[in-house]
Amino acid sequence: MTAPAELSPTLQLACDLIRRPSVTPVDADCQTQMMNRLGAVGFQLEPMRFEDVDNFWATHGTQDGPVLCFAGHTDVVPTGPVQQWQHEPFEALIDADGMLCGRGAADMKGSLASMVVASERFVQDYPNHRGKVAFLITSDEEGPAHHGTKAVVELLKARNERLDWCIVGEPSSTTLLGDVVKNGRRGSLGAKLTVRGKQGHVAYPHLARNPIHLAAPALAELAAEHWDEGNAFFPPTSFQISNLNSGTGATNVVPGDLTALFNFRFSTESTVEGLQERVAAILDKHQLEWSIDWALSGLPFLTEPGELLDAVSSSIKAVTGRETQPSTSGGTSDGRFIATMGTQVVELGPVNATIHQVDERILASDLDLLTEIYYQTLVRLLA
């Protein structure tokens, strides 16, 4: 373990945040620590608590000029079985291999520390910078995400706040820091389908209507359907059935209904309405008695090459020597809410190989490099 006095400012703050067990939606005073640091260098602070979720909005600078926002979350997922960890999950230990170990090291307290330290340095080096540096931080990203970034964005919209560029600190890198940035995400549309039949005795199938038999051809057609071709930025839309339930548990009873849970991860080539209409047409084609409940988690968004992506890519190249690869793969993030403000959004953070796993860890030295990347991006856009 590296002695605390030997740690960089970024690593000291990262360790402090990791040691706070902020399992979603609990913040465990992580945001207080961040706000104290930002307030000390002149940021205007606005805590925003919605229901049981802590959020804050912080700004430095003037309304004139563009706004660059750092966004992220202080909440982490549960640890899982603590006895399976090599070290205590909230110990924030740097091991003999130079790995910073602990829940949230990658997702995403390391990024938060880098954002704060980079911003402290930037506003001290450029006190009269153009535009604004902003922070949008929540403790509700790993949970339902109803009262976090989504709620803050709704408030900012109501106040006609401007947000030109946003860097989300999600762990975007795959093998080496900065090798991948996310410049968009697919949309996520979930559904619970209920197909009704008629319960009966398996020995008298003519007196029953088996919903499993009825639904199987329709589900097979949905699974085989080619929804779109994708485009230069997105792969084709995917359809996956995640749960299928029917039956009473008895071997001699034809069930009365079937439920299926499925999800679309969809590109900008498809729309919510279009997907819903095509699903309905296939179900009707098979003459099913059905009902469906839809749940939209987020629309697809895309940041095409431009000022933000150029600044981030150039900063990664200057600090690491690497050419970054923009990607829209993976799950959803809070970037989907921020993008609704017309904001260019890029996700850039540590290597994601161990996120949500036992023994989550990242290379400790990567956080100092990430701080420099964030700092250089600030300089390129707002100095």
Curated annotation (Swiss-Prot):
Cofactor (UniProt): Zn(2+); Co(2+)
EC number: 3.5.1.18
One protein family per Pfam: Peptidase_M20
Gene responsible for this protein: dapE
Keyword Secreted: no
Binding note for cofactor: Binds 2 Zn(2+) or Co(2+) ions per subunit.
Annotated protein name in UniProt: Succinyl-diaminopimelate desuccinylase
Source organism of the structure: Pseudomonas entomophila (strain L48)
Primary role: Catalyzes the hydrolysis of N-succinyl-L,L-diaminopimelic acid (SDAP), forming succinate and LL-2,6-diaminopimelate (DAP), an intermediate involved in the bacterial biosynthesis of lysine and meso-diaminopimelic acid, an essential component of bacterial cell walls.
